[in-house]
């Protein structure tokens, strides 16, 4: 599939992004301003997650699978290449869990021949970057890398699928 070019949106986040799906499914009594404040207050976890996503993107682009022998290499990349203090990694995330998720995600994305970090666009206020995506034979596959303590939410993937349908003019019933 030839995806549209949205390179001008790389490393940007939309207000109405699938990653912050709570705007679309806000529970009654939830204050969105408090939610956004809490998200930004966990800056190291976000920085580490961004670095792990970048490592995953590079691995998928080069089709280089991760294995248990590269765990220390990933830790070294975080501390040396991304200049994240080792203490911040220890306090900010469960590195063993994050590495396990990273390994599964990278290896699965390579196995399914997925494209990493694909921007799906509807408007300047509603776009998001799918961590890994493929669309072949009317089968849409979207994977989302989770490296933190937050729960995985199907709503985020549903919004990515909706953005795909809107951008590429597919009706949901046309997709398996």
What are these regions (language model features)?
Residues 1-75, 79:
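Charged, glycine-rich intrinsically disordered N-terminal tails and low-complexity linkers that flank
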Residues 44, 48, 55-142, 148-155, ...:
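Catalytic cores of nuclease domains that cleave nucleic-acid phosphodiester backbones
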């Amino acid at each position: 599939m030839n995806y549209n070019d949205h390179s001008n949106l790389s490393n940007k986040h939309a207000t109405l992004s699938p990653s912050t799906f709570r705007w679309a499914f806000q529970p009654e009594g939830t204050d969105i301003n408090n939610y956004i404040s809490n998200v930004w207050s966990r800056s190291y976890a976000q920085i580490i997650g961004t670095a792990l996503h970048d490592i995953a993107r590079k691995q998928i682009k080069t089709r280089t699978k991760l294995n248990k022998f590269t765990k220390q290499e990933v830790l070294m990349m975080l501390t040396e290449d991304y200049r994240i203090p080792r203490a911040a990694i220890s306090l900010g995330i469960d590195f063993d869990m994050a590495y396990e998720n990273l390994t599964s995600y990278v290896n699965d994305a390579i196995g399914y021949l997925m494209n990493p970090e694909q921007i799906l666009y509807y408007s300047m206020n509603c776009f998001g970057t799918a961590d890994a995506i493929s669309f072949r034979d009317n089968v849409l596959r979207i994977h989302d890398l989770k490296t933190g303590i937050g729960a995985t939410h199907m709503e985020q993937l549903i919004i990515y699928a909706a953005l795909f349908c809107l951008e590429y003019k597919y009706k949901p019933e046309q997709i398996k």
